[in-house]
Design a protein with these regions (language model features):
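Cytoplasmic juxtamembrane interface segments
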Residues: 65-81, 144, 148-149, 153-154, ...
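Hydrophobic, aromatic-rich alpha-helical transmembrane segments
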Residues: 10, 14, 18, 22, ...
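Alpha-helical transmembrane segments in multi-pass membrane proteins
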Residues: 14-74, 92, 123-128, 132
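Juxtamembrane helix-loop-helix connectors linking adjacent transmembrane helices
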Residues: 40-52, 75-144, 159, 248-252
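Transmembrane helix-loop junctions and nearby membrane-interface residues
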Residues: 33, 37, 108, 112, ...
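Transmembrane helix-loop-helix hairpins at the membrane interface
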Residues: 130-252
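Short, Lys/Arg-rich, polar N-terminal cytosolic tail immediately upstream
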Residues: 1-12
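Alpha-helical transmembrane segments of multipass membrane proteins
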Residues: 24-36, 58-63, 99-108, 141, ...
Length: 252
């Protein structure tokens, strides 16, 4: 009898974990789909980064609304929206920023030189477009995507996938899963008819690697401050670098 009860408990725990896994997936997937639909209603045909800015702002509202739903019994601070361990965060971010700027600058310049300096950006570099692009990449994107992935998704998974693995550093299974979902989110597709519209292996790999780093930072500090700053710095610096290279090599 005791063995049967234990087996039943194990099965129930397993089924609950499967349910939570798919719930976390549905959160980011449906938030993205709903934000796409609502943004298209207002900004179809607009400048791409204007569209993305509204899309990501809608994502923030929807993710926070889910966090605040009755019955969740968690404050926004528990979801990571706090300034805990900010001194630790800033020390890590400083090291990350230096390494990221040096590494990505060298990599981008070398790959651009080897490939004959092709255009990095597919829009006209007017002052308005540059400002919208930089605001999105250096402010909005990190806040939105980290609230969704290291906030809502990770926070949903963490009570059930809290066991950690050590691979040179310590990270929970919740952190790994959130990084996988983050990488999947960088694959473009349409539902009807289903087709893959964008698949860049290098971009997906980098998204996964950065997702792991953001998750480790989230777990180390208990806050989304670090992941948001790191995300905005990583995307923001590349945006500045791309603009400078494009202006020098192509003039617009």
């Amino acid at each position: 009898m005791e063995k049967q009860i234990n087996d039943l408990n194990v099965r129930n725990i397993f089924l609950k974990k499967i349910l939570i896994f798919f719930l976390a997936f549905l959160f980011f997937f449906l938030i993205d789909r709903a934000a796409i639909y609502l943004t298209d209603l207002a900004l179809t045909g607009s400048f791409g980064f204007t569209w993305l800015s509204l899309h990501h702002l809608i994502q923030i509202v929807m993710a926070v609304a889910i966090m605040l739903m009755p019955g969740r019994h968690r404050s926004l601070s528990n979801w990571g929206l706090n300034f805990k361990n900010s001194d630790v965060t800033l020390k890590i971010i400083l090291k990350f920023t230096i390494g990221w700027i040096i590494g990505t600058t060298i990599f981008t310049l070398v790959t651009q030189w080897l490939s004959g300096w092709p255009p990095l950006l597919d829009f006209y570099l007017s002052i308005e477009n540059i400002l919208i692009y930089l605001i999105f990449e250096s402010i909005i994107v990190g806040i939105s995507e980290e609230i969704v992935f290291r906030g809502l998704v990770y926070g949903t998974l963490s009570p059930y996938f809290s066991n950690k693995v050590k691979i040179g550093f310590s990270i929970s299974y919740a952190g790994i899963i959130s990084a996988v979902f983050f990488a999947i989110a960088h694959i473009g597709f349409q539902i009807s008819p289903f087709s893959i519209t964008a698949f860049a292996p290098m971009q997906i790999f980098i998204a996964f690697a950065l997702g792991i780093f953001y998750a480790v930072l989230r777990e180390k500090t208990g806050s989304l401050l670090g992941p948001i700053l790191a995300h905005n710095i990583s995307d923001g610096w590349l945006s500045i670098l791309y603009i400078v290279i494009q202006l020098i090599t192509h003039g617009n």
